[in-house]
């Protein structure tokens, strides 16, 4: 334990060397649905056309709310080594790129341009998600019915989000998805995987550990962009990452966690 604390102390040295005050960098993670319907997740929402005139007005409303955070940097869910993002954003600033339906474009690029940012920061890192191991373990050990029940709950929650989006604005949808109650339910479904395993075949725990690993690496890439205690980083990410990234921020004493509801001044619709 002593070695762990020493290691963590060494990691904190660069930011700990700043002048001591109550000022800390602030990080706000905006959990979003995937507006372009890429279908990359096990359970996926079916979003309507974000480029329709009505949705575009709603995106503009969302942008105005996010400006209240006064972001100094915007981080997005794209590969940390991506050169494409830099080219696209530069072309967008030059009027040579047409925004796609992706939330990176619709929220990230638009907001960054309106704030006068010259760059936008990809922070994603891919990771293993060994769901097949969990499925095979459940089948081999008479636990398939329990695993199916977890999947059914997740599918029902995604369906409820589909229904919610059809009758609410983009801002209201994101308020709903970023609410503490919905985030807690999402995190709970990951922890429901923990019992699927036994000594020497930790299928469920390994899945959760892999997810933890990916998200803490993402968080590393976010905090690596902090240059001063007055930094305010907006992180735009798929909502499945929200609970885990918030946990990282909340447990890091060198930064301050902010939430969407801090900007709206109202409780999320639930």
Language-model segments: which ranges?
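Proline-aspartate-enriched helix->loop->beta-strand connector
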Residues: 70-76
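A cross-kingdom marker for long, charged
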Residues: 208-270
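Acidic/histidine-rich helix-loop elements
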Residues: 34-55
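Boundary at the C-terminal end of the N-terminal hydrophobic targeting segment
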Residues: 17-23
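Hydrophobic, often amphipathic alpha-helical segments used for membrane interaction and targeting
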Residues: 87-226, 248
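N-terminal post-signal-peptidase region of extra-cytosolic proteins
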Residues: 48-63, 93, 220
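Sec-dependent signal peptide recognition
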Residues: 1-7
